Amino acid sequence: MEVYNLRNTKEKILTATEQLIYKKGYTGTSINDILDETATGKGQFYYYFDSKKEACLAVIDNHVKIWQKHLLNGILSRDESPLANLKEMLDWIYSDHAQKKIYYGCPVGNLVIELSALDEDFRKPLEQLFSDLQKKIAENLSALTGLLVKQNLPAAHAIIAQIQGSLLLLKVTQDLNVLESNFDLLKTSFEKVGEK
């Protein structure tokens, strides 16, 4: 029972940290914010995390694991058609935002924007995640085009930029139709690649 409570407390702190950073940013989130949100004391926070930075690194690690499970090793690694995989990638991202009332942007993209230039410890896992995503998208594009994966890396990079740009526009407009419209255009471009 005690082990469950300890794990539960750590998860509660991690979840609150993730949500606060998503909404307020890393700089805008204080340890006191996390303590208030979780109704825990400093001792409990510092039992699990040495610092706010360490808690944020755990948040990044959690995002990486989710993306690896659902997107990199899931959707983009399926034996379905590569066109279906690429479209499903967009649907997965869209569905995460469609259920929200306020659009804060991409949780990972927000971390990249705020933290990549501040600290290598933050930048490295985020860069690796985007590099892995680029490779998986390129693999699917290669199956569509017949070109080598390395030949499709620039196009995969551009797709990531379009996705992140669309999420940035969603954040600034607070209009889900913007994301839907941009993703529909991306899906159409995937179909055109598949026709060649």
Curated annotation (Swiss-Prot):
Residues 7-67 form the HTH tetR-type domain. Signal peptide: none annotated. It comes from the Bacteria. Keywords: DNA-binding, Transcription, Transcription regulation. Coiled coil: none annotated. InterPro entries: Homeodomain-like_sf, HTH_TetR, Tet_transcr_reg_TetR-rel_C_sf, YxaF_TetR_C. GO terms for molecular function: DNA binding. Residues 30-49 bind DNA. SUPFAM superfamilies: Homeodomain-like (SSF46689), Tetracyclin repressor-like, C-terminal domain (SSF48498). This is Uncharacterized HTH-type transcriptional regulator in lacX 3'region. It comes from Lactococcus lactis subsp. lactis (Streptococcus lactis). The lineage of its organism: Bacteria, Bacillati, Bacillota, Bacilli, Lactobacillales.
